């Protein structure tokens, strides 16, 4: 892998010697033991982009990126040596956010040492409204679409609150696009669990839903998310208007319900990029233990506890946040390209006993069908000694591909069984290896003919997709692969 020392654009093609953006000679990334130089020097040259730079004293123009058939509103501010993609929380509105001096200061301070890219998630603010609930997978696609529209090959991803969940998943799935990951007051799960006791109980979440239905348009939740500002009428008025402009009551309620289903705990060990976890000590909305939990499970993550009780990143003491972020980014060092990525592995095999002679025709037809469906669902086919193996960067696409392969094979008179698991993989050319492959292969032995089995790592990441599951309990795959809760995919409501 090579990188431009001027604009930091990364290139996988080792045959390239000069940057396609500005003609600067490319440098090969070396391991940290070989190269201890900082990735971004204080006097690094400004990045040359197709998007015109906007000074920190201006309000940036709102532009649109195309993510599938959805338009995602985004803005670019500043022209620093590193891109930062800011992923907002629950709801947002790009242009009305600037009406708050606190939000404006937050954006401008970040843009003083970076090129800041901000956007409204699909279904909120100035981005297209959608009839279906957005999945984390679709929201990851939106981040990629915005980065591509802004000519950003790699960026530091900064996620706030609910935006941190998709940031965690993005960093694990696309380490080649993620220079580093920063989270602020983020949770890994949004509903109480014996192994995650800090999250709100179902009754507490229901109380929040009731407040949205009855009080949307007022400053809902400001006493918990910004207690230091809750007494200021101007802030209360701005927050109420900001919420109204960000989402309708129905959309806000649907997004809140979807957030309750979020569970990214299984993703954390798969993150392989430099990570900074920031959390305020007395955050009333997301307990500080949730930040500690996340940091403890991301290899090499740095946890910083900040004083204060405000959940909103732009409320309370902003300067302590900027100091930590700027110091973290300025001390990033060149790192070797990671070989491991988070992916959803699909393994399919013929069901029932067959001799080699009997199964050969069916195996050939299954392989042809599976390859075609995998391409349609944007997956990647890999070699497999027995059966069919494919990987996907999105679990929803993987599940729907598995259902499509099963149904297509059945129409052809071929019975199959399949298994899906999301985890770390090593993907090289047409070969895939790693624990995620081993787990999916072991799982398929537990599937009945015609079944598609999914591990909890898949089920937890597809909230809002309309996919239905039936629990099959916890199974001990073997001593090396551990125990996994498995479910049968029962269908798709969409």
Question: Residues of each region from the PLM?
Answer:
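Conserved HGGG/HGGXW glycine-rich cap/lid loop of the alpha/beta-hydrolase fold
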Residues: 70-126
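Conserved acidic catalytic loop of the alpha/beta-hydrolase fold
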Residues: 137-155
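Flexible "cap/lid" loop of the alpha/beta hydrolase fold
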Residues: 168, 172, 177-212
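Conserved alpha/beta-hydrolase catalytic His-Asp/Glu region
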Residues: 215-258, 267
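Short beta-strand/loop motif that positions the catalytic acidic residue
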Residues: 271, 277-279
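Catalytic active-site module of serine/aspartate enzymes centered on a nucleophile-bearing elbow/loop
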Residues: 301-338
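Catalytic NTP-binding/metal-coordinating core of nucleotidyl cyclase/transferase enzymes
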Residues: 335-404, 408
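Catalytic beta-strand-to-alpha-helix segment of the class III nucleotidyl cyclase homology domain
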Residues: 389-493
């Amino acid at each position: 892998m090579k990188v431009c020392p001027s604009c930091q654009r990364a290139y996988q093609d080792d045959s390239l010697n000069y940057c396609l953006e500005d003609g600067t000679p490319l440098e090969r990334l070396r391991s940290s033991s070989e190269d201890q130089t900082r990735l971004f020097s204080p006097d690094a040259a400004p990045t040359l982009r197709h998007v015109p730079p906007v000074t920190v004293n201006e309000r940036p123009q709102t532009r649109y990126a195309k993510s599938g058939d959805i338009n995602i509103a985004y803005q670019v501010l500043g022209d620093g040596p590193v891109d930062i993609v800011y992923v907002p929380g629950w709801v947002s509105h790009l242009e009305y956010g600037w009406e708050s001096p606190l939000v404006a200061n937050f954006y401008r301070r970040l843009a003083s040492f970076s090129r800041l890219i901000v956007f409204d998630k699909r279904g909120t603010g100035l981005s297209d409204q959608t009839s279906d609930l957005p999945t984390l997978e679709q929201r990851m696609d939106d981040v990629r679409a915005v980065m591509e529209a802004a000519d950003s090959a790699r960026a530091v991803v900064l996620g706030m609150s609910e935006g941190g969940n998709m940031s965690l998943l993005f960093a694990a799935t696309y380490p080649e696009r993620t220079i580093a990951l920063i989270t602020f007051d983020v949770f890994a799960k949004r509903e109480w669990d014996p192994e995650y006791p800090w999250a709100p109980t179902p009754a507490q979440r229901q109380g929040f839903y009731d407040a949205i239905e009855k009080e949307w348009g007022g400053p809902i939740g400001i006493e918990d998310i910004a207690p230091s500002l809750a007494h200021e009428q101007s802030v209360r008025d701005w927050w109420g208007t900001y919420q109204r402009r960000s989402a309708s009551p129905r959309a806000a309620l649907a997004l809140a319900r979807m957030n309750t289903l979020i569970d990214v705990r299984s993703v954390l060990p798969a993150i392989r990029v430099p990570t900074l976890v920031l959390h305020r000590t007395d955050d009333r909305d997301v307990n500080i233990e949730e930040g500690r939990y996340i940091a403890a499970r991301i290899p090499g993550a740095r946890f910083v506890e900040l004083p204060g009780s405000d959940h909103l990143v732009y409320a309370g003491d902003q300067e302590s946040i900027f100091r930590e972020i700027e110091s973290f980014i300025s001390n990033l060092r060149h790192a070797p390209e990671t070989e491991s990525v988070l992916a959803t592995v699909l393994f399919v095999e013929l069901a029932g006993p067959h001799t080699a002679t009997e199964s050969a025709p069916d195996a050939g037809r299954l392989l042809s069908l599976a390859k075609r469906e995998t391409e349609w669902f944007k997956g990647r086919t890999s070699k497999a000694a027995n059966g069919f193996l494919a990987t996907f960067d999105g679990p929803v696409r993987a599940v729907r591909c598995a259902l499509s392969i099963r149904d297509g094979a059945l129409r052809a008179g071929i019975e199959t069984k399949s298994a899906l698991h999301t985890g770390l993989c090593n993907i090289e050319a047409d070969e895939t290896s790693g624990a995620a492959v081993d787990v999916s292969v072991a799982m398929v032995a537990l599937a009945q003919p015609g079944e598609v089995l999914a591990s909890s790592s898949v089920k937890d990441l597809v909230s809002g997709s309309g996919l239905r599951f039936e629990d099959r309990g916890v199974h001990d795959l073997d001593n090396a692969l551990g125990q996994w809760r498995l479910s049968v995919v029962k269908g798709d409501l969409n």
